[in-house]
């Protein structure tokens, strides 16, 4: 199903030769209007510009060839139809399908195979139950606290703030994720418990962080003499320890084939987004994601937004050797989006073992980081322009703000100034500027792309979420790694359990290294 191995692809050999002398973006006339128009793609409400990437037609043709040799579209089709994509062949692994796309497939007409169709059907059933629940809950409660960690917090939180500016709401939303009790204490100080719905999210029903925070909140409700069962909602898998209607006002379900970092379009995001903005806004969000799911099956790379972005990322990472990628949204609504992308990209593709269980000898996921523009222009952009490391930048922008507030100063509005800064940074990174004063010299040839929509609406938020989900999936397919497990988080959790045992006096085994550390910090005597 994966075609040739990544390093065996003929297209990769051609790309390696091209990478020795990539296009010079600083050359006079390089960024002509013809190049800018040609190296762009408009689809599904977005315009994507990659004229400031160090690629030319020959390079793009070779990248298209690489997508064909690695059968990336076929792999995407298999994933969306329910093939077993989460596995390591010949080794014990989760061996599951990957069906986050099915959680929104029901909002559009799509022929699905049995496994995917079942998840789509169950997702629709859960959504209809959610609509009934919200009718009562939104009338009764003014506040919602979501408890979860990783994908149970990062995606829903990013999408809540992305939609907040375009969806008027009188609801107050808080997120509690860290096991640090100060996180819970901060939120408890801000809320009226009687008016608050607490949503606890854990697929397994045993995740340490939400379990600990749920206990803190249950104690707070008990101390106030309030009915716990009338204020707590669970989102978990069927049959988990949390799947207990006697302990919760309502229980919503998700499935093993829905990974945490891909779960925002399931009830993991549905309850909080539906409560905050209404059921219709949640459906619009799903429709945006579903539109990109269909678009991601477009065969030609230069007509497929997430595939094109993925392959430009492969070019920057594997051929030009850049170790990090900055994602810079010029939108306050996306202030938590990069944190979600860090998990979605790095937990998916931060792997060094192939799907055949073999050590790989090439680079996989770059470090993903970033912040909101224009703020970050005044913090780390100095390094982007003149630092010793070249960092590809993915700019995200909108032609109109969400809330409608604006003013004109010195002949231009704040929204115009914001967008002008986005374009200026991309051009400055690409073109640079020569100067006899070496301290004022900008070398240029620092690649970037720009993804622009009219406005950050619920539909565009869903599309943006799915765009990056599929970008990272395509990259994992290209590299031949399993983008859908996260074994890297398990070792630290196992050791933490042992250390907790030492600290509580119930250590089952000797762990001299941990004891030494604990004594150093005066935790043990």
Curated annotation (Swiss-Prot):
What GO biological process terms are annotated to this protein in UniProt? gluconeogenesis; glucose 6-phosphate metabolic process; glycolytic process
Biological or metabolic pathway of the protein: Carbohydrate biosynthesis; gluconeogenesis; Carbohydrate degradation; glycolysis; D-glyceraldehyde 3-phosphate and glycerone phosphate from D-glucose: step 2/4
Q: Which domain of life is it from?
A: Bacteria
The record's GO CC annotations read:
cytosol
GO terms for molecular function, please? carbohydrate derivative binding; glucose-6-phosphate isomerase activity; monosaccharide binding
- Where does this protein reside within or beyond the cell? Cytoplasm
Reactions mediated catalytically: alpha-D-glucose 6-phosphate = beta-D-fructose 6-phosphate
Keyword Cytoplasm found: yes
Q: Which Pfam families match?
A: PGI (PF00342)
Whether Magnesium counts among this entry's keywords is no
Which Enzyme Commission number(s) are listed? Answer: 5.3.1.9
Name of the top EC class for this enzyme:
isomerase
Which residues are named in the active-site annotation? Answer: 347 (proton donor), 378, 493
Spell out the InterPro entries in the cross-references.
G6P_Isomerase, G6P_Isomerase_C, Phosphoglucose_isomerase_CS, SIS_dom_sf, SIS_PGI_1, SIS_PGI_2
**What are the alphabetically sorted keywords of the record?**
Cytoplasm, Gluconeogenesis, Glycolysis, Isomerase
- What is the recorded function of this protein according to its Swiss-Prot or TrEMBL entry? Catalyzes the reversible isomerization of glucose-6-phosphate to fructose-6-phosphate.
What does the sequence similarity comment in the record state about its family? Belongs to the GPI family.
Matching NCBIfam families: PRK14095.1
By what name is this protein known? Answer: Glucose-6-phosphate isomerase
Question: What is the organism lineage in this UniProt record?
Answer: Bacteria, Pseudomonadati, Chlamydiota, Chlamydiia, Chlamydiales
Tell me the gene name. Answer: pgi
């Amino acid at each position: 199903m994966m075609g040739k191995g990544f390093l065996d692809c003929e297209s990769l050999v051609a790309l390696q030769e091209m990478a020795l002398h990539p296009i010079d973006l600083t050359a006079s006339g390089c960024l002509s209007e013809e190049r800018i128009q040609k190296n762009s793609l408009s689809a599904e409400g977005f315009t994507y510009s990659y004229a400031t990437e160090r690629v030319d037609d020959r390079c793009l043709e070779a990248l298209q060839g690489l997508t064909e040799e690695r059968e990336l579209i076929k792999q995407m089709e298999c994933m969306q139809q329910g093939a077993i994509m989460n596995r390591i062949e010949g080794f014990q692994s989760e061996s599951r399908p990957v069906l986050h796309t099915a959680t929104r497939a029901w909002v559009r007409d799509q022929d699905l195979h049995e496994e995917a169709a079942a998840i789509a059907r169950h997702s629709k059933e859960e959504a209809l139950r959610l609509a009934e629940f919200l009718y009562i809950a939104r009338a009764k409660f003014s506040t919602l606290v979501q408890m979860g960690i990783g994908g149970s917090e990062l995606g829903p939180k990013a999408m809540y703030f992305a939609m907040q500016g375009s969806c008027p709401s009188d609801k107050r939303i808080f997120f509690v994720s860290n096991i640090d009790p100060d996180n819970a204490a901060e939120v408890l100080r801000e809320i009226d418990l009687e008016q608050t719905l607490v949503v606890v999210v854990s697929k397994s029903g045993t995740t340490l962080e939400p379990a600990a925070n749920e206990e803190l909140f249950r104690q707070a409700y008990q101390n106030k003499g309030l009915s716990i069962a009338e204020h707590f909602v669970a989102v978990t898998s069927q049959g988990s320890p949390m799947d207990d209607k006697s302990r919760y006002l309502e229980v919503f379900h998700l499935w093993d084939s829905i990974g945490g970092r891909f779960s925002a379009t399931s009830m993991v995001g549905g309850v909080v987004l539906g409560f905050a903005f209404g059921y219709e806004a949640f459906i619009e969000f799903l429709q945006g994601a579903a539109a990109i799911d269909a678009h991601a099956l477009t065969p030609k790379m230069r007509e497929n937004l997430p595939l094109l972005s993925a392959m430009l990322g492969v070019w920057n990472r594997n051929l030009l050797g850049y170790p990090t990628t900055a994602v810079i949204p010029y939108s306050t609504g996306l202030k938590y989006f990069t944190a979600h992308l860090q998990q979605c990209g790095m937990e998916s593709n931060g792997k060094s073992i192939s799907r055949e269980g073999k050590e790989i000898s090439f680079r996989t996921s770059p470090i993903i980081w970033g912040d909101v523009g224009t703020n970050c222009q005044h913090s780390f952009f100095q390094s982007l322009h003149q630092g010793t490391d070249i960092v590809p930048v993915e700019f995200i922008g909108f032609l109109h703000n969400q809330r409608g507030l604006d003013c004109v100063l010195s002949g231009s509005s704040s929204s115009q100034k914001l967008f002008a800064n986005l374009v200026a940074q991309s051009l400055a990174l690409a073109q640079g500027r020569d100067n006899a004063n070496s301290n004022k010299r900008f070398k240029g040839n620092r690649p970037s792309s720009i993804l622009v929509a009219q406005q950050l609406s619920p539909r565009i938020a869903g599309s943006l979420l799915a765009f990056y989900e599929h970008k990272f999936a395509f990259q994992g397919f290209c590299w031949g790694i399993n983008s859908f497990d996260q074994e890297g988080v398990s070792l630290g959790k196992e050791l933490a359990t042992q250390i907790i045992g030492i600290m509580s006096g119930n250590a089952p085994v000797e762990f001299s290294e941990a004891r030494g550390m604990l004594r150093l910090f005066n935790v043990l005597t």
